[in-house]
C-alpha cells in the first residue's frame, strides 16, 4: 500500500 495505490492496494 502506497500513496499512489491506496485504493487498489490498501494496507490492511
From Swiss-Prot:
GO terms (BP aspect): neuropeptide signaling pathway
Tissue: Abdominal perisympathetic organs.
GO CC annotations, alphabetized: extracellular region
Keyword tRNA processing: no
Keyword vocabulary terms for this entry: Amidation, Neuropeptide, Secreted
Positions of modified residues (Valine amide): 12
Localization terms from the record: Secreted
InterPro entries for the chain: Periviscerokinin
Pfam family, one: Periviscerokin
Main location: secreted
Domain of life: Eukaryota
Transmembrane segments: none
Keyword rRNA-binding attributed: no
The protein's role, per its UniProt record: Mediates visceral muscle contractile activity (myotropic activity).
Family under the similarity heading: Belongs to the periviscerokinin family.
Name of this chain's protein: Periviscerokinin-2 type 1
Species, as recorded: Celatoblatta sp. (strain Blue Mountains)
